[in-house]
Amino acid sequence: MPKLILCRHGQSEWNAKNLFTGWEDVQLSEQGRNEAITSGRKLKENGIEIDVAFTSLLTRALETTQFLLAESDQEWIPVHKSWRLNERHYGKLQGLNKDEARKEFGEEQVHQWRRSYDVKPPAQTEEQRESYLKDRRYRHLDHRMMPYSESLKTTLERVVPIWTDKISQHLLDGETVLVAAHGNSIRALIKYLDNVSDEDIIGYEIKTGAPLIYELDDNLNVIDHYYL
């Protein structure tokens, strides 16, 4: 029976500082590393054997994958990295303290940017975007596909192709697949898998560094899902 493991990265240094992160590349905090290690230990204790892993191009997700696989004695499995699993792009909000953003733009406006399904934060300027265009990890990505800002809706639109083309193919072969990614890219996958409404998905909270197990039938319909 195919099994999907969704794991949001452990707490990052910017999570700890209450900053909007998005596509900014930051490392795990000490707490985040411990969360990832604990997740790997839980997988090992529950006898879960992973066949293949998928993660984003951002360090906090890569570190989570590494710690989780090392702790579960599965470092040798193939790991595929893709920009499509990156966190939602928060545009001009990236790097801002969330409390300071609320003071500047208003509580209601920031809540709408964060929690509405199809509302994007203010877009980055060309100058702000330049650092991504020069980043080697995106050198094979058509720059026209690189976002200036994203809503959860547009995040879902870029996540679905990697599900359809790659992740689901391993599951259809009966494999156990780990996806170690980010709050919003995982939220997008959950919406897609569980057919969650636009209104309901915005209230979903994804725990950091905690394996969320999806048990699927042979047609990839959801049988059950639960946190370890």
UniProtKB/Swiss-Prot annotation:
Q: Which residues form the active site?
A: H9, E87
* Protein residues bound to substrate: 8-15, 21-22, 60, 87-90, 98, 114-115, 183-184
Known Pfam families for this protein? His_Phos_1 (PF00300)
The EC code for this enzyme is 5.4.2.11
Phylogenetic placement of the source organism? Bacteria, Bacillati, Bacillota, Bacilli, Bacillales
Instruction: Output the PANTHER family linked to this UniProt entry.
Output: PHOSPHOGLYCERATE MUTASE
**UniProt protein name:** 2,3-bisphosphoglycerate-dependent phosphoglycerate mutase
| Organism this protein belongs to | Staphylococcus haemolyticus (strain JCSC1435)
NCBIfam families noted in UniProt: pgm_1, PRK14115.1, PRK14119.1
